[in-house]
Amino acid sequence: MHTIDVVYSDTAKVNQFYGAMYRASFLPREMSDCNGDYPEFSTGITKHIDPSLLSLHSSLKKYGDFSMWDIYRAQLPLYNIVVPTLSGRMMQSLVDMYQEGGWLPIFPCWNSYTAAMIGDHCSVALADAYAKGVRNFDADKAYEAMRKNAFETPKSFAEYKNGMGRRALESYLRYAYIPLEDSVKEAFHTCEQTSRTLEYAFDDFAVAQMAKMLGHDDDYN
């Protein structure tokens, strides 16, 4: 909270600002214990990291409960500016989720994939972090995950139902939008096609920018 010093005559406004900063630190939260144990993403199986490595390489710490649809616009970009090292640890946790579960999550909460909300905003978070100079995460593996979400769908309905991959991606790739006639199976709301299209368009912009920054010119073009 002391990363930003505010000097202003209205103490109520200053208190309001720091109160907001404090609340912005609640989530995402650290999932790894001090002894090195952490629950593997999507399975909950206990994994272990040598505590001595945790003290030497804090990037190994695991973070979870990314209410992504709510935080990708403001909170995470703020982290990139004021606590970039912490942001990198969180971005690496997203990459780890992809490696452990096979897909970059849409809305990772309760240490699991969920089908909550629309969009694919982990891609935006990762691209924004890299664009702002955050480097303590595996950007190449992050891009691999982002690209997979943008072009592939789960092979089984069980995976799709569990929240893996983008919903209605087939229609989106075919038409460049999601028509109202696509009922979007397992969606919380059945009339969100326009909103989903807009969110995916922004997500794809982020994927394209990541491709450009990493030198994947064919993908970018």
Over which residues does each language-model region extend?
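Extracytoplasmic/secreted proteins, especially bacterial periplasmic and envelope-associated proteins
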Residues: 12-19, 73, 86-89, 93, ...
